[in-house]
Every structure is written in C-alpha cells, then in structure tokens.
Amino acid sequence: DRFVRFLLEELLPDAEAKKTTDGRLLNFSKNPNDRAIAGASSGGICAFTAAWERPDAFRRVFSAFGSFVAMRGGNEYPALIRKTEAKPLRIFLEDGTEDAWNPLLGHWFDGNLLMESALAFSGYEVAHSWGHGGHDGVHAENIFPDVMRWLWKGWPKEVECGVSRNESGWYTEFRSIL
C-alpha cells in the first residue's frame, strides 16, 4: 500500500499546492467516485492495486496491457478476487494477443484474461478490449476515448458493488444435493 499512500499523501497534496499559469490553485475531488486511475504495463497492475486496496480513494480503473504475471503478487489476484467480497470498482482491461511472454512468468495476455474472468465472476463491472498487438500502447491509445466514456458512463451516479457468483447460492444448492 506504499504506492497508493504516496499518491494520496504526497503526490496529490503536492499537486494541489501548485498554481496554474493564471494563478489558480488546482482542486482535486476527494470523492472516490470522481476519481479514476490508469496505467500501462507495470503501471496497469499498480493502478489496479491502488483501487483494489483503496476503493475509498479510486473507483474507476484502466489497466492497459497490465503486467499481472510479471509483478510480485500479481498472479495471485484472480484467486484473491474470487474469494473476496466485491468492491465498488469499475475496471477496463486492455491487452494484445501478442503481448510479452516469459518461460518463467507466462504470457501477459493470459494474465489479463484470468483477471477479466475473475472480476466478471465476482460481480465487478468489467470490460475489456483485446487487440492483436504486443506490449505497447498502440491499441490502448486507439481505444482510450471509448475507455473513458465507458469508465465515466452514468456519472455522477456512484459506482456500485456487483453481486459475486460466490454469493448467488449455487454452492449452497450444490452442497444440499450431496
């Protein structure tokens, strides 16, 4: 949580202390529903992690070709997401089928597929765009306006928690027939 604390306790306050060229102070909303966070590659997993750990600070996430298989603990997110009560987050994932691959870590694209599957299973409002490119920003740049429209749809309505399939009762029904 050091990264998100740095953002909230140091970076944003420092930015708010600055003035625009015409002398006005910057004013950032403290309402998490008014905030989004985005990143690409390792920044994509950082953006997701910041919102995951602090949904009281960020509610909208754009992860472009997020390195969920390469960063420590990132490969654990799909299982953690499935086992944790849903949080009020809206998440957009982007990646390309030709993203990076490493014999020790696996395929970055597969990591994003697992994230999308876990988020959908757990009731999150999640969308994705899978392109054919590699570990670069070409596809992400092309879809960025649509991503922003999707992340901010319905604003100022609050982003809400979804209902996880864990909570749908299927497991209880399944156990009752055993």
Predicted segments, located by residue:
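Non-catalytic cap/lid and distal C-terminal segments of serine-dependent acyl enzymes
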Residues: 1-178
